Design a protein with these regions (language model features):
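Structural alpha/beta surface segment adjacent to cysteine/selenocysteine redox centers
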Residues: 19-119
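Residue-level preference for long, well-ordered alpha-helices that form the structural scaffold
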Residues: 11-14, 51, 55, 155, ...
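Surface-exposed, flexible loop/turn segments at secondary-structure boundaries
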Residues: 12, 43, 184
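Conserved aromatic-histidine-acidic binding/catalytic patches
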Residues: 10-13, 84-88, 124
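C-terminal cap of thioredoxin/glutaredoxin-like
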Residues: 18-27, 114-206
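Local sequence-structure signature of Cys/Sec-based thiol-disulfide redox active-site neighborhoods
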Residues: 1-24, 38-40
Length: 206
């Protein structure tokens, strides 16, 4: 079975701009292509940031470009969130995604998209458990099962391993590859339209 590997980061605005596309690809191809999500660890460890006024200015410039290129909406609640000087740590939302890959793998793509929407449209803080519990409830995932794995040492270790694996494939987000019979083909680096992505996948299928 072909595999689509998606390297992203939950705090990457361009990845949010790409979220409708990855969800559409998943809905179309989930029965014939395996999807693997690899959060890349953009801001982790020593690179964890604070949502300072300088960072917010940087975000707003990029968000405008994302909206223009992708047509996605950034919510008013997100703009309110930008007024808070919260910590920006990619490890936490990445660990939430890794958790779902382990406890409900078939829901990883919808969960990942919902995590991005939680920040960029609904203005939710990705540092808080309640943000993920709300998504888990919406997707029918048992909340206690999620919490137990999410806070486990295994999840933390596996998230670090995922970062290391992601960097072998890409250093920029989003990047999309297709693996077919041991051969890897990059079909997206940055942003591509859904029609272009579908065409590239169809070529590789045939």
């Amino acid at each position: 079975m072909m595999k689509l590997i998606y390297i992203m980061d939950p705090l990457c605005g361009w990845c949010y701009g790409n979220s409708d596309n990855i969800l559409e690809l998943f809905e179309k191809y989930k029965n014939e292509i395996k999807f693997e999500i690899l959060p890349g660890g953009m801001w982790v460890g020593e690179n964890v940031r604070r949502q300072s006024p300088q960072m917010v200015s940087f975000f707003l410039r990029h968000d405008t470009a994302v909206e223009e290129h992708t047509g996605i909406d950034f919510g008013n609640a997100y703009r309110e969130l930008l007024k808070q000087e919260i910590v920006l740590d990619s490890e936490i939302p990445s660990r939430a995604i890794v958790t779902i890959q382990n406890i409900a793998p078939e829901l990883t793509v919808p969960f990942m998209v919902a995590v991005q929407k939680a920040r960029y449209y609904l203005g939710k803080d990705l540092n808080l458990d309640e943000t993920y519990l709300s998504i888990a409830e919406d997707l029918g995932i048992d909340e206690q099962t999620f919490l137990d794995y999410f806070h486990s040492d295994k999840a933390k270790k596996e998230t670090q391993n995922t970062f290391q694996k992601a960097v072998q494939f890409a250093q920029s987000f989003p990047t999309m590859l297709v693996e077919n019979n041991g051969e890897y083909t990059v079909i997206e680096q940055g942003y591509a339209s859904i029609s272009d992505l579908e065409k590239r996948i169809e070529v590789l299928k045939n």
